[in-house]
Every structure is written in structure tokens, then in C-alpha cells.
Amino acid sequence: MSPTLMFVLLLCGVAAESIRETETMDPTSMLEYESSGSFPDEVFDDDEIDEDDDYAIDEDDEDYSGSGTDKFDIDDNDEDEEEEETATLGNQIPELDFDQTKTGRKIETNEIDNEIWSPTKPKILEPSNEISMASTGSEGFFQRTEVIVAIVAGTLVGLVVAISFIVFLVIRRNQNGDLVKKPIYKKTSTMEV
């Protein structure tokens, strides 16, 4: 095989991979999305200036900045305002009957109860369809199909490159005659002796 054929095959593999990548991404749909706060150009025109003011400025409003540091008139007639009395709940702590357990059963002070008593039957928990966030993060890296496909594709491309490199070296050495076994020295003929 010629090196150009190997290069063409490698180029076809790379092109096929890039075509697959562009099939998954639709560039026209990406242009439809606008970022948060962006408006089309037709909504706001900076050239138009409203000539008529719909609001009036009071002189009282100019005195106050809203920061609370300006001087303003305080009415001294605070007594006229009705003050609402707050209802206090008090600081009484309800006394609990310590002879009763959580179940409401009364226990005698001399009674020793070694029996574990449950007020209701245990509930049978049905498995939920909800996926907890902890279980989604525990998915292994190699369990994702995209990762496995990428590893297989990378391995195949690497294998093709390695095979083409070896074939290229064999062809080149064969052309130079390096692969033919040549003796290190020539035997002299016995007639000369």
C-alpha cells in the first residue's frame, strides 16, 4: 500500500468523525436563543425621545433622597397615633406528664417494661420514581455511552495510524534493500589458496 492511500484513508476517518459531530449540533437552532435581558432591535429605539412628560416633580420629593440622612419634619403629635398592643404568649412552659410515653400509654412507676411496643404497624415503603441527586453523581465515568464510543473511536484511529506507520517503514526499507539478508563477509574461494 502506498503512503498516500493510507493518508487518504486516515483523512476519510477524520472527515467522517467531524461530520458526525456537526450532525449532532444544529447551528440554526443556536441562533434562536437570546441571552437573558436581550431584546430585539425593534423594541427600543434610541432615536425616539418622549416630548411629553407623564410625571410631575413635587418640591417635597426633591428634599428627600430616600437614604434617611436628610432633614425632614417630624410630627410631635406621636401620642395621637394609636399604638397597637402586642399580645404576649407569656413565658409559661407547659408541664408534661412524664409518666406517659410517646404512645400515650400510662406507665406505672414500679412497672418494668422490657417489651418494645410500637403504636402503629410499620409502613411498607414503595420505591419511588424520583432519582436522588446523590445517585446521579455516582454514575461511573465509563458507564456513559459517549465515553465508550469516544474510547473505541480513538483506539481504532490509533490502530490505523500505527499500522500505516509500520507499513510505511516496511515499504521504505524494502525499496532501499535493507531487508535482504547480506552476509557480513564474503567467503574466499578455496582455489586461490
UniProtKB/Swiss-Prot annotation:
Annotated GO biological process: cell migration; convergent extension involved in gastrulation; neural tube closure; protein localization; Wnt signaling pathway
PTM info: O-glycosylated; contains both chondroitin sulfate and heparan sulfate. Ser-36, Ser-65 and Ser-67 can all be modified by either chondroitin sulfate or heparan sulfate, and the protein exists in forms that contain only chondroitin sulfate, only heparan sulfate and both chondroitin sulfate and heparan sulfate.
Chief place where the protein resides: membrane
Tissue: Expressed in the animal hemisphere from the 4-cell to the blastula stage. During gastrulation, expressed in the involuting dorsal mesoderm and ectoderm. After involution, localized mainly to the anterior neuroectoderm. At later stages, expressed in the brain, branchial arches, pronephros, tailbud, and at low levels in the somites.
GO molecular function, a single term: frizzled binding
Compartments in which it is found: Membrane
Ranges for region Disordered: 23-90
Membrane topology: Single-pass type I membrane protein
Cleaved signal peptide residues: 1-16
Topology Cytoplasmic: residue spans: 172-193
Disulfide bonds: none
Residue stretches spanning the membrane: 151-171
Stated role: Cell surface proteoglycan. Regulates non-canonical Wnt signaling, being necessary and sufficient for fibronectrin-mediated translocation of dvl2/dsh to the plasma membrane. Required for proper convergent extension movements during gastrulation, which shape the neural plate, and for subsequent neural tube closure.
Subunit structure: Interacts with the Wnt receptor fzd7 and its signal transducer dvl2/dsh.
PANTHER family: SYNDECAN
Family stated for the protein in its record: Belongs to the syndecan proteoglycan family.
Name the record gives this protein: Syndecan 4-A
